[in-house]
């Protein structure tokens, strides 16, 4: 959850991949 929030800052679509994690 926390990681996805940080990644969403520069990733965006990457958040969808990290969301399950």
UniProtKB/Swiss-Prot annotation:
Domain of life the protein comes from: Eukaryota
Note from the entry: On the 2D-gel the determined pI of this protein is: 7.1, its MW is: 22.1 kDa.
Protein name: Putative NADH dehydrogenase subunit PS9
Native source species: Pinus strobus
